[in-house]
């Protein structure tokens, strides 16, 4: 849980913005969304594998694009 100490004479808006930024960096909102509903372990593994395949394909496409551009 991110903790923010409000500085002296610091406006509330600025402190709230710092808190939101620290929550974003800690990944709290994405974690809450991910845990909102139960996901079976098999479904979780399937989703993780699909995202890994997608990342791999994107990496290959980027490398091919670099090779075709550099001449």
From Swiss-Prot:
Annotated S-S bridges: none
Pfam families recorded: Ribosomal_S21
GO CC, any one term: ribosome
InterPro entries, per the entry: Ribosomal_bS21 (IPR001911), Ribosomal_bS21_CS (IPR018278), Ribosomal_bS21_sf (IPR038380)
KW Ribosomal protein (keyword) present: yes
GO molecular function: structural constituent of ribosome
Keywords recorded for this protein, A-Z: Ribonucleoprotein, Ribosomal protein
Any one GO BP annotation for this protein: translation
Similarity comment: Belongs to the bacterial ribosomal protein bS21 family.
Name of the protein described by the UniProt record: Small ribosomal subunit protein bS21
Organism: Blochmanniella floridana
